[in-house]
Amino acid sequence: MTQFASPVLHSLLDTDAYKLHMQQAVFHHYYDVQVAAEFRCRGDDLLGIYADAIREQVDAMQHLRLQEDEFQWLSGLPFFKPDYLNWLREFRYNPAQVCVTNDNGKLNIRLTGPWREVIMWEVPLLAVISELVHHYRSPNAGVDQALDALESKLVDFTALTANLDMSRFHLMDFGTRRRFSREVQQAIVKRLQQESWFVGTSNYDLARRLALTPMGTQAHEWFQAHQQISPDLATSQRAALAAWLNEYPDQLGIALTDCITMDAFLRDFGIEFASRYQGLRHDSGDPVAWGEKAIAHYEKLGIDPLTKTLVFSDNLDLPKAVELYRHFASRVQLSFGIGTRLTCDIPQVKPLNIVIKLVECNGKPVAKLSDSPGKTICHDKAFVRALRKAFDLPQVRKAS
């Protein structure tokens, strides 16, 4: 296979906002914590043939660094501290932390090292894999086809919402990790900027260059790592929620609910957390059932749901977002994060269902037991059983 002509990535900020938000919290609170993370392809794609090309891109990433204009822009945001930004200025990717192999056609990737550094690999590395694969599989597809597909979707969207009050509909681009390419994501976001309901992007590079609001708080790994950082497994989720508020007392307050199922999350999400966090993010399971549980929980605590925001981000497209908006708009604030269905929705192109997830923290297992059993990730079945017991989970979920 011929090698990709040039580096896929051009900016250290070409990543999701929550990576930097979490990295700052790790820098301040868990500087010496060590982790391991692994790549998973949830589909049947045999991606091992791209291992050498991916390795070449990983090696090229060591040359990325925070540029002065990027540093100044980050310094103007309200939640970053000078000590972290000065450290980030000196940060360089370390390719030695990444092991890429072709295992009889299956792509294996394992990341190891200090959490404060490893945390940065996931999103850009997935974006690299996605762009490389689509470059070889669909060499004739690109920006024009992506924009044509988007225009068709926007025509349908306009018809679908003709009789709706859309003043409280807020859409965000969450499409970095599985985008067709960097150029396609930028073109899609620039087109969506023309719509009044488009409010921002999770991509820090695009947010800076297009003067958009960067969107994101924390990911599953924040909660997973606390399973080993916290001295008591049963209180690890509460420890993660409290540590986040310690770093961000009154900002970035959308909590992810499905690291250990929504029901287990709500048992930990008492009046103090529910009052201080601005809202919740859905990332697995039935979205309507999840939203109803969230609203009922706020009401039970005496909190007006209209003062809180629910963010839906699981496998969304525009029609699904409208359906959820119709259901919930009068009862709670809403935002919708759409990823693959915006940045890799091109006819004849099959998006990759790929993830990189934490599997160890300080040499011990961690797990994600989401509201969609197929999204469960953990090597250690005994740890999964211990986690289920600690959080009183009612059903067995297969560890994959």
From Swiss-Prot:
As stated in the Swiss-Prot or TrEMBL entry, residues carrying the post-translational modification Phosphohistidine are H220
Record PTM? Transiently phosphorylated on a His residue during the reaction cycle. Phosphorylation strongly increases the affinity for substrates and increases the rate of nicotinate D-ribonucleotide production. Dephosphorylation regenerates the low-affinity form of the enzyme, leading to product release.
PANTHER family with a match to the protein in the record: NICOTINATE PHOSPHORIBOSYLTRANSFERASE (PTHR11098:SF1)
What domain of life is recorded for the organism? Bacteria
What is the source species? Salmonella dublin (strain CT_02021853)
Entry-linked NCBIfam families: NAPRTase (TIGR01514), PRK05321.1 (NF003704)
> Looking at the UniProt record for this protein, which Gene Ontology cellular component terms does it annotate, in alphabetical order?
cytosol
Q: Name one GO molecular function term.
A: nicotinate phosphoribosyltransferase activity
HAMAP family from the UniProt entry: NAPRTase
Q: In which pathway does it act?
A: Cofactor biosynthesis; NAD(+) biosynthesis; nicotinate D-ribonucleotide from nicotinate: step 1/1
- Job of this protein: Catalyzes the synthesis of beta-nicotinate D-ribonucleotide from nicotinate and 5-phospho-D-ribose 1-phosphate at the expense of ATP.
Assigned protein family: Belongs to the NAPRTase family.
Under Enzyme Commission nomenclature, its number is 6.3.4.21
Q: What is this protein called?
A: Nicotinate phosphoribosyltransferase
Enzyme class at the top of the EC tree: ligase
Listed under catalytic activity are: nicotinate + 5-phospho-alpha-D-ribose 1-diphosphate + ATP + H2O = nicotinate beta-D-ribonucleotide + ADP + phosphate + diphosphate
Cleaved signal peptide residues? none
Which GO annotations describe the biological process of this protein? NAD biosynthetic process via the salvage pathway
